[in-house]
């Protein structure tokens, strides 16, 4: 393996695209909490003073969409003097939702490979390809660049919410570049944080002085706490640390950029370290394999790495609309596997049920929003859907399945 630098980014919950993801998933949570059979494809658009809900929803649930949208925007932090042209109390909220197409509904409700097995009776909600990935670079079996980028973004939001740095505003981005030697991460090359802030900080109005103060504050209150338990830590001498490289970041959020659901799919997954099938997650109910099958693919890949059958594993699944069973399953271990990829593929087929209804049942995806107090999917809409130690995600719990793979693989070793 060659030496290289790999870079991944994350964004905070106040980023315009992430506002949209959270609103779409808050709608999904609310609908599933009241009607677990809801069919949801909810898209959100935000701009200065405007939030638009659109898409297709079929549900028995009755929902005050406008009230819910304002609640999410307020909780993110867009309210009052720091709203910046996008106040939760005064922004316009437009709702333009249709029902799910009966042609799609028919294929999902009654798969073409239907039989007495109930899990065969639910077809995939669309065609498509999904990837799952895991590697042994971090305890959560995620690539280090995206893992660290999320840590920084989470800590950045935390010090804002807790008013440790009360000049911070909701919009922000992080980016991390990691040095690899022979394919193994060895040091943090660069950390970049762009964070929205007030025009004046502690009486300081000079642009360069403000930037320098933010840089010093972020190193102490964001970078060091976010990395204190890592084996690979940033160094004042060796790690390049960039903050707001344009000089200032006062105008942000939807006032600075329009936002749209599903535009941060690489942030949501593996930071570009693994392939992506192109389908977004947020606002989609579990019958949409863009979401549920991507979770299942991660579950498979993580189980393989946890079982130490490979140091890296990437799993591709493909589906046809209205068909229950995957069209194809592919596994790649990049030369790190201890058994052949053909044998690994057979292990997957024999130990994982990857039909949509089986995935939904395995992870209890329809019922989790209600069980979690009305909020489950929204929590995944910021800071990644995978490797989340702060959330109890069923596709991340692989102890039992990895042990099963260890036993099943013994005859192949």
From Swiss-Prot:
EC number of the protein: 2.5.1.6
Localization (cell): Cytoplasm
Pathway(s) annotated for this protein in UniProt: Amino-acid biosynthesis; S-adenosyl-L-methionine biosynthesis; S-adenosyl-L-methionine from L-methionine: step 1/1
Entries under SUPFAM superfamilies matching the protein: S-adenosylmethionine synthetase
Domain of life the protein comes from: Bacteria
A single GO molecular function term of this UniProt record: methionine adenosyltransferase activity
PROSITE patterns: ADOMET_SYNTHASE_1, ADOMET_SYNTHASE_2
PANTHER family, sorted: S-ADENOSYLMETHIONINE SYNTHETASE
NCBIfam families for the chain: metK
Subunit description: Homotetramer; dimer of dimers.
Protein name, per record: S-adenosylmethionine synthase
Organism: Prochlorococcus marinus subsp. pastoris (strain CCMP1986 / NIES-2087 / MED4)
Primary gene name: metK
